[in-house]
UniProtKB/Swiss-Prot annotation:
UniProt record similarity statement: Belongs to the OMP decarboxylase family. Type 2 subfamily.
PROSITE patterns xrefs: OMPDECASE (PS00156)
Any one Pfam family match given in the protein's UniProt record, by short name: OMPdecase
Protein name as annotated: Orotidine 5'-phosphate decarboxylase
Pathway this chain belongs to: Pyrimidine metabolism; UMP biosynthesis via de novo pathway; UMP from orotate: step 2/2
Protein's organism: Clostridium perfringens (strain ATCC 13124 / DSM 756 / JCM 1290 / NCIMB 6125 / NCTC 8237 / Type A)
Matching CDD domains: OMP_decarboxylase_like (cd04725)
GO biological process, alphabetically ordered: 'de novo' pyrimidine nucleobase biosynthetic process; 'de novo' UMP biosynthetic process
Reactions accelerated catalytically: orotidine 5'-phosphate + H(+) = UMP + CO2
Length: 287
């Protein structure tokens, strides 16, 4: 199960998930000047970040929107980034947030679990119901793939739907999480975690212990750290014995060179930030 590979990466490298949500605005001007086209520039920047953070991160999350926005050249960079990550034996989360059903979802599964855009995990939106998850299950069972499904996100608008009362003292996110946790028990790895994970933001610490206890076999993809206000202490509450989840950081890592005022060595700055993040979370876990 891919869940075991993720667990073991976390044990070895820590919980950091490097977000390659790479906007052209994030790339230092002196680095940009080396390239004549955006596709090569974007991929080269990502490659530098990957090389600098590979051994201090559990995985990489690539947000497809940043590449789609650049058209075919952007998708070429996306493809090349995924290919390079596979070459480096890195675990890849394609942040695509698909949410359709039936034949359409089957095509999404084929597109992102096979071929040019192949990744290890993808993100899904469950709003249409559990049958929006079904087309991905054969890949989980037979092809060592996994999914992270939106459960309780870190954005302000999460309260519009996710926090609505669903009856019996439960909110919508409770119901979604429980259904996914039950389904996930059919796809457990040897370390006790499923290849069906949940996206759970770290910006509501008061709910952390209850969610971690209830969703006992679900690995968490945890956004909200850094730029969205989440702290190491917030994150630690969603983990179990230092595992059971990965913590995404995009801007804080990609733009570390700005805080450190060292654009020439942007990749090394990204590495330092990833190490600092990893160590801060480890310290928070031990407290």
């Amino acid at each position: 199960m891919i869940a075991d590979k993720l667990f073991e990466k976390v044990e070895k490298n820590g919980v950091v998930c490097v977000g390659l949500d790479t906007s052209l605005d994030y790339i230092p001007e002196e680095f940009k000047s080396k390239f004549s086209n955006e596709s090569d520039m974007l991929f080269a920047f990502n490659k530098e970040i990957i090389d600098a953070t590979l051994d201090v991160s559990a995985c990489f999350k690539v947000q497809i929107a940043y590449y789609e926005a650049l058209g075919l050249k952007g998708l070429e960079s996306y493809k090349n980034t995924l290919s390079y990550l596979r070459e480096k034996n890195a675990l890849i989360i394609a942040d695509i947030k698909r949410g359709d059903i039936a034949a359409t979802a089957k095509m999404y599964a084929k597109a992102h679990f096979e071929g040019d855009f192949e990744s290890d995990f993808i993100t899904l939106n469950p709003y249409m119901g559990m049958d929006s998850i079904d087309p991905y299950l054969p890949y989980i069972e037979k092809n060592e793939k996994g999914v992270f499904v939106l459960v309780r996100t870190s954005n302000k608008g999460a309260e519009d739907i996710e926090y609505l009362e669903a009856g019996h003292g439960k909110k919508v996110y409770d119901v979604v999480g429980e259904k996914l946790n039950t389904l996930g028990k059919n796809y457990l790895g040897k370390h006790g975690y499923s290849s069906i994970g949940g996206v759970v933001g770290c910006t509501h610490q008061e709910e952390a212990k209850e969610m971690r206890d209830k969703l006992d076999t679900m690995p968490f993809l945890i956004p909200g750290y850094g730029a969205q206000g989440g702290t190491a202490k917030d994150v630690a509450a969603y983990l179990k014995n230092g595992n059971g989840g990965i913590v995404n950081s995009s801007r804080k890592i990609l733009l570390a060179y700005k805080a450190m005022e060292d654009s020439k060595n942007f990749a090394e700055c990204a590495r330092k930030e990833a190490i600092s993040m990893r160590d801060s979370i480890r310290e928070a876990i031990l407290k």
